[in-house]
């Protein structure tokens, strides 16, 4: 059974790093105490892999699990193959996907998650689960071999979604950017995850968690809303 927890962000309002995810992760990983999480740190542009690993280990110590970054493996995929759970951290989605391709991790992650290995990721780690990374918010832009992502979720994901424009901002709003994407890709669906929200995906069903409803945009910016604790098929 496919079992994934996709988190919009690592923080919500004034909470600490991954603090708001605590109850979700405790429930999500209730049967995995003492097991190993393979952590993928590639999105962390402004910190070393060791620093990112330590940050996540400290934040998730309450899970009582062994968190090991893939960069410790002679081949990074070795850590993925041996792990009980897979996690991908947030940061820059372009850098993340580029290195997933470079280290030959796309297929092994896809295979393991499709065969019941739990997966969780935040921000870029949620974005990369979708069909492609073409609805990321990120800079700098690096060029992976393809913008096609893990495709464990068949639609587009836009984390950190904020509706409307901030005062004094004269650029495009998030809705306007997504509308442009849907003009170019009219058959796509974009699931927008506001801050503090998450999707728990089990096979072909998804449940909304968190503080804010999740939005689904389609051609002509038709918008569906999925309220907190709603379960829907995708």
From Swiss-Prot:
Catalytic reaction(s) noted: Dipeptidase E catalyzes the hydrolysis of dipeptides Asp-|-Xaa. It does not act on peptides with N-terminal Glu, Asn or Gln, nor does it cleave isoaspartyl peptides
Active site: 123 (charge relay system), 138 (charge relay system), 160 (charge relay system)
Protein name in the entry: Peptidase E
InterPro entries: Class_I_gatase-like, Peptidase_S51, Peptidase_S51_dipeptidase-E
EC number: 3.4.13.21
Cellular component terms per the entry's GO annotation: cytoplasm
CDD domains, alphabetized: GAT1_Peptidase_E
Known function: Hydrolyzes dipeptides containing N-terminal aspartate residues. May play a role in allowing the cell to use peptide aspartate to spare carbon otherwise required for the synthesis of the aspartate family of amino acids.
Organism (species): Haemophilus influenzae (strain PittGG)
Keyword Protease among record annotations: yes
Top-level taxonomy: Bacteria, Pseudomonadati, Pseudomonadota, Gammaproteobacteria, Pasteurellales
Keyword terms, alphabetized: Cytoplasm, Dipeptidase, Hydrolase, Protease, Serine protease
A GO term, aspect molecular function: dipeptidase activity
Family, per entry: Belongs to the peptidase S51 family.
Principal place of residence: cytoplasm
Lineage top rank: taxon: Bacteria
Subcellular location: Cytoplasm
GO biological process terms, semicolon-separated: proteolysis
NCBIfam families: PRK05282.1
